[in-house]
UniProtKB/Swiss-Prot annotation:
Protein known as: Large ribosomal subunit protein uL16
Physiological role: Binds 23S rRNA and is also seen to make contacts with the A and possibly P site tRNAs.
Gene Ontology MF term list: rRNA binding; structural constituent of ribosome; tRNA binding
Single GO cellular component term: cytosolic large ribosomal subunit
Subunit relationships: Part of the 50S ribosomal subunit.
Biological process terms in GO annotation: translation
Keyword check for tRNA-binding: yes
Swiss-Prot/TrEMBL keywords: Ribonucleoprotein, Ribosomal protein, RNA-binding, rRNA-binding, tRNA-binding
């Protein structure tokens, strides 16, 4: 499971999920990517389940990059505890995902295999996603 090794503060505010992703919106490492279409918290267990689903399908072929990391602690109070008496203890770690963020990347497999692997990963995640391909930036810009 993905968790931070050490953190400056054990507990965090929930924060807002307004707006689109600032960075990480293009396919950088692989050939294909899985892009978020809506904002959500994605837990470390969901990330791991999606990774396993993809790697099982591609069967040792290709490489998978995980572009999100669960660095936000989410606290929870125990069951049947009265209100008040402080904030609960950290229960799980989540990654804040905003629309446009590339969450996973894949390379070294044919497009139809990548598409199916990403489709299996989408079912493990709590948000709508879309399959994207790497956009080659014009290579003839410096010639002339």
């Amino acid at each position: 499971m993905l968790t931070p090794k050490r953190v400056k503060h054990r507990k965090q505010h929930r924060g807002k999920m307004a707006g689109n992703a600032k960075g990480g919106t293009t396919v950088a490492f692989g050939e294909y990517g899985l892009q978020a279409m809506e904002p959500s918290w994605v837990t470390n267990r969901q990330i791991e389940a999606a990774r396993i689903a993809m790697t099982r399908y591609i069967k040792r072929g290709g490489k998978v990059w995980i572009k999100i990391f669960p660095d936000k602690p989410v606290t929870q109070k125990p069951l049947e505890v009265r209100m008040g008496s402080g904030k609960g203890s950290p229960e799980k770690w989540v990654a804040v995902v905003k629309p446009g963020k590339i969450m996973f990347e894949l390379a070294g497999v044919p497009e139809e295999v990548a598409r199916e692997a990403m489709r299996l990963a989408m079912h493990k995640l709590p948000i709508k996603c879309k399959f994207v391909k790497r956009e080659e930036v014009g290579g003839d810009a410096h010639e002339g």
